């Protein structure tokens, strides 16, 4: 069998290349084997990645056993929770592009034959997906697995419990000592945080796309089945290599439709919209944001995981995981069940072996949480290119909300205003100049949204922003407002006291001023200019596109 890597290891002209490969431990026999790239993301400062140094060893062992040469390399990672609420969050979304670029660079520079991606958290998963689609060599994903939920006084807790606990301390609901107990209990093991936050949402959707084996998104990091899954994934990769099945053969428009469908049915993180749009672009597919509303209108919400309920990823795994959700959705004909996956099975074959919905963690289609989906795209004069809301996390009485604007031009200003008591019932908190260009980096607004919940305002206050949200955000929070303020978007002309209408059932978001006043303000609007000290972030701000296009870089 001829390999792509023969370009660097075959023929007399490649003697210097082989000399260097010998220095890396390769032998004569290895020059007849495929070079299998392993993109690891081990790092000491992300709980979802601290175990990946050990986790990769049986994967490399399996590659050798099956006749390949494992070539491990690492990519960077940012822990969004640790980067949250300060200038560090400017680097989170941009890190996705660096990860994709790193994979392209290593795989193509060394002409690797196939790729194993080992991500787990937030931007690492989509960054690797983008990179894998870009290089388009046979690829399988093996995520590090989710964290076990914590427990305090018989109640499950997670990272969002800690964020919301800050507001509870401020309003006197709990003491600082009680918060410390929650803090010490919320993250008890390695793994991606235990709710349906961005990391776990993306790991689950990697299954749906067809690039990972069943169980990839839900089997816990500390579960022995995770290693079995990993070894089986390596076996699947060698089948893909033999048949020359590549990521773009698997990630089709139908696969993206199914990913959005499952995402919407399980109330995944709103960040998934941004990432799936970027993934579509790397797959050569122009995906229309408005299409997501069509999917949402026909897709029931049948699963709610923290922060939308008391259930956690371990509960979803217990009842059958993502295949069980897909099995239930297939009863309505919502999925393309003939699609092939890296497992060698079709989606239909995978779900035929899945348990039926238990009726609690995964509800039946006859008894959904709601008849439409857990994510919606809003349009209107405030968001001509669209905005995203995670409806699964919105109090039903807040689905339609009219309130008076209170405006902040940064996340820091907003947090100070919320915790300082400036935000009152009936307000719509407007946080702007936090978009991809304006931030730069489109920071997550988890600290402000958690402060609102912790201050007891979750059913009395809405929040809109051109930034984005953590998967842990809940409440009437509308993000990704496009165009952003820094690009001249209408969110920049909102004034304190203006009335804003958020109408989720009708997918509308409107600034309630006259058309004449609106046009006059837009005519006179000059976006604020920020000084960006970082040369990397300056380049990012210059090249990044709108959130409505996935916030990808375009030269």
Swiss-Prot record:
Keywords: 2Fe-2S, Amino-acid biosynthesis, Branched-chain amino acid biosynthesis, Iron, Iron-sulfur, Lyase, Magnesium, Metal-binding
Entry binding sites for [2Fe-2S] cluster: 121, 193
InterPro entries hit by this protein: Dihydro-acid_dehy_C, DihydroxyA_deHydtase, DiOHA_6PGluconate_deHydtase_CS, ILV_EDD_C, ILV_EDD_N, IlvD/EDD_N
Pfam families, A to Z: ILV_EDD_C, ILVD_EDD_N
Enzyme active site: 470
PROSITE patterns, A to Z: ILVD_EDD_1, ILVD_EDD_2
Pathway entry: Amino-acid biosynthesis; L-isoleucine biosynthesis; L-isoleucine from 2-oxobutanoate: step 3/4; Amino-acid biosynthesis; L-valine biosynthesis; L-valine from pyruvate: step 3/4
Catalyzed reactions: (2R)-2,3-dihydroxy-3-methylbutanoate = 3-methyl-2-oxobutanoate + H2O; (2R,3R)-2,3-dihydroxy-3-methylpentanoate = (S)-3-methyl-2-oxopentanoate + H2O
EC number: 4.2.1.9
Modified residues (N6-carboxylysine): 123
Keyword Magnesium annotated: yes
Biological processes per GO annotation: isoleucine biosynthetic process; L-valine biosynthetic process
Co-factor: note: Binds 1 [2Fe-2S] cluster per subunit. This cluster acts as a Lewis acid cofactor.
Subunit annotation: Homodimer.
Family classification: Belongs to the IlvD/Edd family.
Function field: Functions in the biosynthesis of branched-chain amino acids. Catalyzes the dehydration of (2R,3R)-2,3-dihydroxy-3-methylpentanoate (2,3-dihydroxy-3-methylvalerate) into 2-oxo-3-methylpentanoate (2-oxo-3-methylvalerate) and of (2R)-2,3-dihydroxy-3-methylbutanoate (2,3-dihydroxyisovalerate) into 2-oxo-3-methylbutanoate (2-oxoisovalerate), the penultimate precursor to L-isoleucine and L-valine, respectively.
The protein's name: Dihydroxy-acid dehydratase
Chain's gene name: ilvD
């Amino acid at each position: 069998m001829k390999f792509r890597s023969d370009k660097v290891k075959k023929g007399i002209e490649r003697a210097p290349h082989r000399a260097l490969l010998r220095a890396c431990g390769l032998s004569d026999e290895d020059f007849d084997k495929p070079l299998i790239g392993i993109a690891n993301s081990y790092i000491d400062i992300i709980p979802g990645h601290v175990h990946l140094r050990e986790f990769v060893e049986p994967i490399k062992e399996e590659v050798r056993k099956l006749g390949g040469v494992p070539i491990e390399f690492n990519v960077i990672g940012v822990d969004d929770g640790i980067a949250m609420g300060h200038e560090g969050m400017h680097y989170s979304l941009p890190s996705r592009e660096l990860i994709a670029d790193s994979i392209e660079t290593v795989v193509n520079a060394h002409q690797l034959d196939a790729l194993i991606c080992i991500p787990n958290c937030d931007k690492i998963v989509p960054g690797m997906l983008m990179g894998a689609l870009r290089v388009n060599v046979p690829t399988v994903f093996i995520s590090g697995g989710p964290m076990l939920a914590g427990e305090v006084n018989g109640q499950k807790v997670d990272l969002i419990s800690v964020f919301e606990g800050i507001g509870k301390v401020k309003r006197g609901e709990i003491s600082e000592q009680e918060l410390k107990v929650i803090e010490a209990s919320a993250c008890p093991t390695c793994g991606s945080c235990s709710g349906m936050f961005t990391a776990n949402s993306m790991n689950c959707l990697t299954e749906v796309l067809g690039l990972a084996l069943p169980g990839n998104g839900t089997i816990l990091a500390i579960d022995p089945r995770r290693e079995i899954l990993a070894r089986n994934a390596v076996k699947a990769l060698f089948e893909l290599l033999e048949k020359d099945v590549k990521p773009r053969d698997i990630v089709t428009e139908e696969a993206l439709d199914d990913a959005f469908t499952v995402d919407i049915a399980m109330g995944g993180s709103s960040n998934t919209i941004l990432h799936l749009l970027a993934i579509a672009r790397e797959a050569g597919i122009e995906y229309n944001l408005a299409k997501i509303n069509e999917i949402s209108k026909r897709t029931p919400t049948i699963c709610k995981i923290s922060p939308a309920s008391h259930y956690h990823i371990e509960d979803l795994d217990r009842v059958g995981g993502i295949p069980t959700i897909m099995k239930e959705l297939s009863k309505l004909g919502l999925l393309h069940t003939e699609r092939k996956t890296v497992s060698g099975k079709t989606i239909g074959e995978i779900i035929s072996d899945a348990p039926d919905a238990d009726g609690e963690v995964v509800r039946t289609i006859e008894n959904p949480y709601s008849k439409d989906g857990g994510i919606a795209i809003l349009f209107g004069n405030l968001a001509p290119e669209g905005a995203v809301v995670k409806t699964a996390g919105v109090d039903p009485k807040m689905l339609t909300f009219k309130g008076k604007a209170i405006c902040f031009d940064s996340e820091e200003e907003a947090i100070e205003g919320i915790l300082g008591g400036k935000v009152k019932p009936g307000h719509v908190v407007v946080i702007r100049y936090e978009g991809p260009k304006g931030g730069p980096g489109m920071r997550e607004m988890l600290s402000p949204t958690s402060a609102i919940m912790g201050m007891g305002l979750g059913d009395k206050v809405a929040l809109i922003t051109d930034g984005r949200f953590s998967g842990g955000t809940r409440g009437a929070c509308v993000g990704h407002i496009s165009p952003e303020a820094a690009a001249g978007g209408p969110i920049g002309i909102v004034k304190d006291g203006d009335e804003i209408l958020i109408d989720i059932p009708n997918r509308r978001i409107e600034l309630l001023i006259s058309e004449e006043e609106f046009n006059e303000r837009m005519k006179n609007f000059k976006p604020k200019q920020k000084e960006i000290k970082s040369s990397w972030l300056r380049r990012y701000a210059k090249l990044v596109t709108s959130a409505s296009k996935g916030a990808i870089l375009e030269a």
